[in-house]
């Protein structure tokens, strides 16, 4: 039954992804960014709805009042595809740091490109860091939030990746606060797995973390400790009660 429900979800997901990609291309030269963001992120909301209908995956938010701080740098745990879609509209308008290869994905990549992301070339890490900081500060000055997954890539549930300091560096340079986001989406929507598991994803949003006079190394460590600490306290997301224990990468 889980395979069938996951298949139906994937079918709707892929068809709707193609549709919103075409819409994004059509409206790109016509509508201003604020309207493009509203239209394109309707797809993100649809995915949340479709996930609930097909796979029985819901979510609850703790600390939602802290999401009203604009502009800010959002630093979130990266376990799944789920958070990339949820956070995109929840903290919007938001510019996301992502690998440029995503733009090559037909339809989906087109929709992404219309939302002012910051695309980086991971084959040239030094130049990528410079571009992240330069464009990140520009987006914040334009009034956008900036979303960063400090671990750089998805980490399987139960693992703790290395937290990069670029998010803290940008926030300090731009003089904006950091909002940390902890969640356990990977338990219901595991990375690189087709099957989706019914349950309730917990999303915990921190109070604004002020950056004035802070050191980026310590600030990054504080964010990491907060995120991983909140995840450790969460009850299992899946209805079957499966919960993994975090293992930090060395």
Indicate residue ranges for each PLM-predicted region:
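A hydrophobic membrane-anchoring feature enriched in long, contiguous, low-charge segments
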Residues: 4-30
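Generic preference for hydrophobic
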Residues: 61, 74, 96-97, 203-205
